[in-house]
């Protein structure tokens, strides 16, 4: 199979459309994006190290990706199950739980990185 650059660009375009379709419409994603701006701003102000930036960016990416997966799962469940069903609710809860695990882990990592900077003030 030959590589098709135009097809690759279209694929990236579809991915961006997917992300943008959630921004401003999903409350939890909006919360995580606001937290991202705050964390990145704090990183610049406090002058965190390259290694710390690497960990912070990885945490941000994991949480945002988890939130996007959660949104996709919720929409798919809504499409497949038009009426309330206990398993559909459980699937949504499990997906939301995965986001919570990622977000809590990221918050703890953030505290580990940022607290030493504030204790020196």
Q: What feature does the model see in each segment?
A:
Residues 1-72, 80, 84-87, 96-121:
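Hydrophobic alpha-helical transmembrane segments
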Residues 91:
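Short basic (Lys/Arg) and small-residue
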